[in-house]
C-alpha cells in the first residue's frame, strides 16, 4: 500500500435517537455521529412491525377515479 494516501480510520461513537450508543470505526473524521434509527429500535430487528394506515388515501383515490371506466 502507498503511504499517506488512505483516509484516517478512527473510532466513532454512534448515538441513536432512542438512546442506544455504540462504538464503531469509520473514516468520518468526527468522533461523534447521531442517527435516527439503529438495530436496537428499527422495526425489522425488533420484530415490532408497524402497519401504515392508508385507508384515507385509498378512499380519496376511489372518490377521484371511481367512476372512470376502461375504454376498449
UniProtKB/Swiss-Prot annotation:
GO terms for biological process: translation. The keyword rRNA-binding applies. Keywords: Metal-binding, Ribonucleoprotein, Ribosomal protein, RNA-binding, rRNA-binding, Zinc. One of its GO terms (cellular component) is ribonucleoprotein complex. Binds 1 zinc ion per subunit. InterPro entries: Ribosomal_bL28/bL31-like_sf, Ribosomal_bL31, Ribosomal_bL31_A, Ribosomal_bL31_sf. Pfam families: Ribosomal_L31. One of its GO terms (molecular function) is metal ion binding. SUPFAM superfamilies: L28p-like. Its cofactor is Zn(2+). Zn(2+) binds at residues 16, 18, 38, 41. HAMAP family: Ribosomal_bL31_1. Belongs to the bacterial ribosomal protein bL31 family. Type A subfamily. Binds the 23S rRNA. Part of the 50S ribosomal subunit. This is Large ribosomal subunit protein bL31. It comes from Azoarcus sp. (strain BH72). The lineage of its organism: Bacteria, Pseudomonadati, Pseudomonadota, Betaproteobacteria, Rhodocyclales.
Amino acid at each position: 500500500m502507498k503511504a499517506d494516501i488512505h483516509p484516517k480510520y478512527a473510532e466513532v461513537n454512534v448515538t441513536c435517537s432512542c438512546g442506544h450508543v455504540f462504538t464503531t470505526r469509520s473514516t468520518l473524521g468526527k468522533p461523534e455521529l447521531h442517527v435516527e434509527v439503529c438495530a436496537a429500535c428499527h422495526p425489522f430487528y425488533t420484530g415490532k412491525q408497524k402497519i401504515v394506515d392508508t385507508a384515507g388515501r385509498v378512499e380519496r383515490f376511489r372518490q377521484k377515479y371511481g367512476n372512470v371506466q376502461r375504454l376498449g
